[in-house]
Amino acid sequence: MMSNSNEHFQFTDERFADLQMLRYRLNGFEDLTLSQQIYIYCLAKATLMGRDITFDQQGKYNLRIRKTLEAIYKHYDGDRTSDDFKALEVYLKRVWFSSGIYHHYGCEKFKPGFSEHFFYEAVSMMPETELPLKRGETKEDLLDELVPVIFDEEILPKRVNQTDGVDLVATSACNFYEGVTQNEVERFYARLKDGEDLTPPSYGLKSKLMKRNGEIVEMTWKEEGMYGTAIKEITSWLLKAQKYAENEQQAHVIDLLIKYYRTGDLSDFDRYSIAWVKQQEGMVDFINGFIEVYGDPLGLKGTWEGLVEFKDMKATRRTQAISQNAQWFEDHSPVAPQFKKAEVKGVTAHVICAAMLGGDEYPASAIGINLPNANWIRETHGSKSVTIGNLTEAYNKAAHGNGFLDEFAIDQETLDLINRYGDVTDDLHTDLHECLGHGSGQLLPGVDPDALKAYGNTIEEARADLFGLYYVADHKLVELGLTPDDEAYKAQYYSYLMNGLLTQAIRIKEGDKIEEAHMRNRALIANWVLEHYSQAVQLVKKDGKTYVQITDYPALRHAFADLLAEIQRIKSEGDFDTARILVEKYAVNLNPELHHEILERYKKLNLAPYKGFINPWMKLEFDEEGNVTKVLLDYTESYEHQMLRYSDEYGTL
């Protein structure tokens, strides 16, 4: 699959552990101009150069462990068919996938399937030049450091801990803090905040906070600071990309991003974000930087990510119909008037084609993104929203006929409903969530955007999901030609509640709680509705199996309206106590018997609960004078080859 041909495209690839690897297709790439293709190529390089940053942010031992495992994988000349070696291979593939030794979704530390003895032996066999040894360090020193981290379940067991009532900083292994307590972190940033500032920077977004000689200091991520060697490579490729920018505004956005990478000044990030929102022309866009804060238990620190994209003009008509009516949706939402935006500004939405994934967007990626995250920028300048159409296409193609819905949907009528409308309403819910949900509502004057602390991410995701659920059933969508009829929404309601009440639990080990913000949000909504609207939705047993039964679809819309109004109030007022009660009551715990049943039913389907993507390999074709004549897309690279190549070509730290 070297060419851009779409015939016989293989969406599914290898499978290991709980992961299924997929491929995504760059539909329409061949229709772009050569200049646009080279622009994408350079931006893709900048996207891949940040890979080591993400590894290091997700745990301070991740890079040394990855490099050691890669050395064994490449140079081990013992029995490569042994159980130990095969287990090391799977472990390494999981480390590549998760950018570290923690599960990308549940955040728990991986348990190695190989023995400590085997690891000692394998490292001892390696040439010293192949191992990540510091100056003066021996193999024994390396083993003394890494063995407890890999094998001792008590040491750094969780990347992001959300357990109520404990020190979230001290009990999380992510590499954003060192030697400080949660209380010290919260006090440090509270002192920086000025309650009167209407345009506050995102304090803490771009630094590691640590204690040195008893004093708390911020280590800023910038060219001449922490991660400087990686950031210099990123800015170098951004400069190369700038020569091929489609217009002056794109070139200006790159200027501002490079300046931010050089200064590390958060006000430079705000200037870049505002310019990025306003940059609407042209086919190509990208995200590159320390953006989302889900990887920090306190929701302050940005994990590095990269995405290069180009517009899907045909599908974008759908999102533009939504964004052009943003004021109507805001005015008619069921939340109290004082929490609504009087004037919705600058909401733009596109369906895009991902061209390259990097950092925290790779291999597992979001399918919808709405940025920037700063509330005041969204209120004053608007936001950009994207739905990633070619990733959704890959998921849908891979899921077709896999037996999942047949097992968990209650009856043939419901199955037919989902098969008929599911893909359409799923895409629409993503559009509404990203484009309008995150962009809706407002904080009351003086409310700290971080007031909900560790519960902020879950409440924000619930708010956006509820906005989408409320409006996917609105006749306005039929009028806009977005849904075929007034029945279509039922497919989304059933799928959503089935997921929130039953099937998302397949991603959680027996005995564990729900940790991840998006999963917590779905559980919160589904469990709250089940309790408060039992006349509309129930869990019922049929032939010994539990199913979701919906008896009143219109009533569910009222349920989503009620909860949306309350969640928006919590966000607008910064009501931490109610946020805590809602999340802890509805979003954290699983019914052990029901969880066991769901896992057993899922096991029989022989499916992988998590999916991620292998990137296309972009290659340049030159003429005799050395000019680029074409950007070729190679869809045949194996997962293992790609990961080893990335470590080689994009190893910056």
Indicate residue ranges for each PLM-predicted region:
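Short, glycine/acidic-rich hinge or "gate" loops at secondary-structure transitions
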Residues: E248-I254, F269, V447-D450, L477-S495, ...
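N-terminal-proximal low-complexity accessory segments that begin disordered
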Residues: N4-K74
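An active-site-proximal "capping" alpha-helix that borders the catalytic cofactor pocket
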Residues: T33, N247, N457-D474
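Post-HEXXH active-site segment of zinc metalloproteases
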Residues: G441-A462
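Short alpha-helix carrying the canonical HExxH Zn2+-binding catalytic motif
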Residues: D423-L436
